[in-house]
Design a protein with these regions (language model features):
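Bacterial N-terminal signal peptides that target proteins for export
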Residues: 2-13
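Active-site gating/metal-coordination segments in enzymes
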Residues: 82-199
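Hydrophobic faces of well-ordered beta-strands that scaffold small-molecule active sites
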Residues: 35-39, 66-68, 120-124, 151-154, ...
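N-terminal carbohydrate-binding/catalytic regions of secreted carbohydrate-active enzymes
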Residues: 39-112
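Mid-to-C-terminal alpha-helical segments outside catalytic/metal-binding sites
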Residues: 4, 26-37, 46, 50-69, ...
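Acidic-and-aromatic substrate-binding clefts and catalytic sites of carbohydrate-active enzymes
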Residues: 42-50, 73-77, 95-101, 127-135, ...
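Bacterial N-terminal signal peptides
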Residues: 11-22
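Catalytic pocket-lining loop regions of alpha/beta-barrel enzymes
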Residues: 113, 159, 166-289
């Protein structure tokens, strides 16, 4: 057999290998459509590995598309610090709200070929949530980039160390500026993704829950996605599962994003926790969203997808399909395999 014939005889095996490697581990348990519902294109230095590398990593683990946004804060490099910070926790220099992040994202996406561009649904986030002008600034962006923006977020409310390092007063979800953002989102029929710690560091009672309850009650037409089920580093609320159940029952406009450490620290903490959270997701199948929460760099992107496989295995096919893409696509007004742009509600 000559080399050419030998190559063609191996081609089916090669194609099969490529097909298998393009899906998450345990792919037989995963739905056909996977949407990353929480992804930062930029890090705290407003830098990124770029779209080309990102899409290659998405292909490695079978992710079809992603909701993507910049980073609302930037880390300051102080004059008396010789080593440049690479993360907001690199040192004790301050952070500040950075409005350029949305333009960096949207302009970078505009430059991509259609094959890449069509896989991303941009959100906007570059505002100071304590500023009563914030909603007006977001409206300007919605008008500046018509048909290109699918939501608002990730907007930072209470966020432990990040809140402490950021210039200005601590934000909270029921601040008047936040309430006006929710009104804007309802007007445009787009969701808001918000990071709001449910409690303080090492405080077991959910002391900041009331602020989110007020936010949700302010405008029931505003769909609010609560990032990480309100959890961050060193946030230890033993009753989180029960609180989440009650909140979903009482607030029809609430959705939970299970990205980042809430999955490791709570949902997949042990076998019992995983089963209990799977039951809650089955109870409210339309209200949970999967995401990676990667921040500008993609080397470990596939692992942040495949970590959900144990949970996916416990869910019904219909619920799994909603968690891994259906719920987010519905919230942003997109049907699977379609490019429907969000439209402003008639006034």
């Amino acid at each position: 057999m000559n080399r050419k014939k030998k190559w063609f005889s191996l081609l089916p095996m090669v194609l099969m290998l490529v097909f298998v490697l393009s899906f998450p581990a345990g792919a037989a348990d995963w739905p056909d459509t996977i949407v990353d519902g929480h992804l930062h294109y930029l890090d705290f230095l407003q830098q990124s590995d770029g779209f080309f590398k990102l899409t290659r990593k998405m292909d490695e683990c079978g992710v079809d598309s992603a909701v993507i946004f910049g980073m609302a804060m930037a880390k300051q490099w102080d004059e008396n610090t010789e080593t440049a910070p690479t993360y907001y926790l690199s040192n004790d220099s301050r952070c500040y709200y950075y409005s350029g992040t949305d333009h960096l994202l949207l302009q970078a996406l505009r430059k991509q070929p259609e094959s890449i561009k069509k896989r991303f649904y941009p959100f906007i986030c570059g505002i100071n949530p304590n500023d009563r002008y914030a909603a007006s600034q977001l409206r300007n962006l919605l008008e500046m980039y018509p048909g290109e923006i699918y939501g608002i977020g990730e907007i930072m409310s209470r966020h432990d160390d990040l809140t402490a390092l950021t210039y200005g007063e601590p934000p909270h979800a029921d601040h008047p500026a936040f309430l006006e953002i929710f009104d804007l989102a309802a007007e445009y029929d787009i969701p808001v993704l918000i990071h709001h710690n449910i409690s303080g560091v090492n405080i077991e009672d959910p002391i900041y829950l009331k602020e989110m309850q007020n936010a949700l009650a302010h405008n029931r037409d505003a769909d609010i996605i609560w990032a990480h089920v309100g959890i961050s580093r060193r946030i230890t609320v033993p009753t989180l599962l029960q609180v989440a159940d009650k909140m979903l029952k009482e607030n029809s406009n609430l959705y939970y994003d299970i990205s980042w450490i809430v999955f490791e620290d709570y949902i997949n903490k042990d076998e019992k926790s995983l089963k209990d959270w799977a039951k809650l997701i089955e109870k409210y199948p339309d209200r949970f969203i999967l995401g990676t929460d990667k921040v500008g760099h993609w080397d470990t992107y596939p692992q942040e997808v495949t970590k959900y496989t144990p949970l996916i295995k416990l869910l019904s096919d219909d619920t799994a399909a909603k968690l891994t893409g259906g719920n987010m696509l519905r919230l942003i007004g997109v049907q699977e395999n379609a490019a429907v742009k969000p439209v402003k509600k008639a006034s």
